[in-house]
């Protein structure tokens, strides 16, 4: 299990921050990060393609997994911001048209299109934006640059590049290949919510039981973000629902910490032990209460009541 220094979530959980913005310091993040963004987190860069850098943590720390969740949620906020910017741009054009305001581009100014993950829901650095490539509008279909060879099998899995991933696996037999931290393509895909990739990897021989150097599992990574579809696929493969990592974090504790109600319920129904405690003495119920997650607390309470009723019978 963990040392007390790694998993100390006592009164600090309640006093320092509210549940909605709660985060714990010191967690090396798992995230897809663009080159302009700051990257002070620990971990090794796996590669850069079209301005994208992949970072893995040296250890997956239960105490600060909220920062991992927050980093993966950044994409959602970027999508919202892009929609707002798009709406403002359209409104501006319509306003100028209604007022007969004629504008012309400033001389000497070149417009450079920057593609980010928020450009499309399933962004890929090796795919051009197809926003203006509808055939019925007379636009030409953009071509995909041949950059697949510059990406590792782990990056392909994280991005959901099924075609290139399948080709790479067939040619090199790297379906269970581990990176410097012991992470497999399946773990990368699970951490980034790539449902189709996870299903493909499992169907083609990926081992869901493999653990990272810090005993990180694909199940724990999926639970920390609440990817219930991926969690279900992994549970159906018979993975250990109570597998703990280097600091005592279990899939259930990660799901509770992320306030993922459906995921918590699914884990409990599949044998997750709610009484397992961290090194500092906190179990899943204690953690839910400390973070103020009432829905999660109710799910755990209901499960415990059922267990007690079964014992009486």
Swiss-Prot record:
* PROSITE patterns linked to this entry: ANK_REP_REGION, ANK_REPEAT
Supply one GO molecular-function term: protein kinase binding
Please give a single GO biological process term from the UniProt record.
regulation of gene expression
The alphabetized UniProt keywords are: ANK repeat, Cytoplasm, Cytoskeleton, Membrane, Repeat
Annotated membrane topology is: Peripheral membrane protein
Enumerate the ANK repeat regions by residue range.
Answer: 148-180, 181-213, 214-246, 247-279, 280-313
InterPro entries membership: Ankyrin_rpt, Ankyrin_rpt-contain_sf
Record text on subunit structure and interactions: Interacts (via ANK repeats) with CCDC8 (via PxLPxI/L motif); mediates the interaction with the 3M complex which is composed of CCDC8, CUL7 and OBSL1. Interacts (via ANK repeats) with HDAC4 (via PxLPxI/L motif). Interacts (via ANK repeats) with HDAC5 (via PxLPxI/L motif). Interacts (via ANK repeats) with LRP2/megalin (via PxLPxI/L motif). Interacts (via ANK repeats) with RFX7 (via PxLPxI/L motif). Interacts with AHRR. Interacts with NEK6.
* Name of the protein in its database record: Ankyrin repeat family A protein 2
Q: Which organism is it from?
A: Bos taurus
Q: Which gene encodes it?
A: ANKRA2
């Amino acid at each position: 299990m963990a040392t007390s220094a790694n998993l100390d979530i006592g009164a600090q959980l309640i006093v320092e921050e509210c549940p909605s913005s709660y985060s714990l310091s010191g967690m090396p993040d798992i995230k897809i990060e663009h080159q302009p963004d700051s990257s002070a987190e620990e971990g090794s860069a796996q590669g850069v393609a079209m301005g994208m850098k992949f970072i893995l943590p040296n250890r997956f720390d239960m105490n600060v997994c909220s920062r991992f969740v927050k980093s993966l949620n950044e994409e959602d906020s970027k999508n919202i911001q892009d929609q707002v910017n798009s709406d403002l741009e359209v409104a501006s054009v319509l306003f100028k048209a209604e007022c007969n305001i004629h504008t012309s581009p400033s001389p000497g100014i070149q417009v450079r299109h920057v593609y980010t993950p928020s450009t499309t829901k399933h962004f890929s650095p090796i795919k051009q934006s197809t926003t203006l490539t509808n055939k019925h509008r007379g636009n030409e279909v953009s071509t995909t640059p041949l950059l697949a060879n510059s990406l590792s099998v782990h990056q392909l899995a994280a991005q959901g590049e099924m075609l290139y991933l399948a080709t790479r696996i067939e040619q090199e037999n790297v379906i269970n290949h581990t990176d410097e931290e012991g992470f497999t393509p399946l773990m990368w895909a699970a951490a980034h919510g790539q449902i189709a990739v996870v299903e493909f990897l499992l169907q083609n021989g990926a081992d869901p039981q493999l653990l990272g150097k810090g005993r990180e599992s694909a199940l724990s990574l999926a639970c920390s973000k609440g990817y219930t579809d991926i969690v279900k696929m992994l549970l159906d493969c018979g993975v250990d629902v109570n597998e703990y990592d280097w600091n005592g974090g279990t899939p259930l504790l990660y799901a509770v910490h992320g306030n993922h109600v459906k995921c918590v319920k699914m884990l409990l129904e599949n044998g997750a032990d709610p009484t397992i405690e961290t090194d500092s003495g906190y179990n899943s119920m204690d953690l839910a209460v400390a973070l103020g997650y009432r829905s999660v607390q109710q799910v755990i309470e209901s499960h415990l009541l059922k267990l007690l009723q079964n014992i009486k019978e």
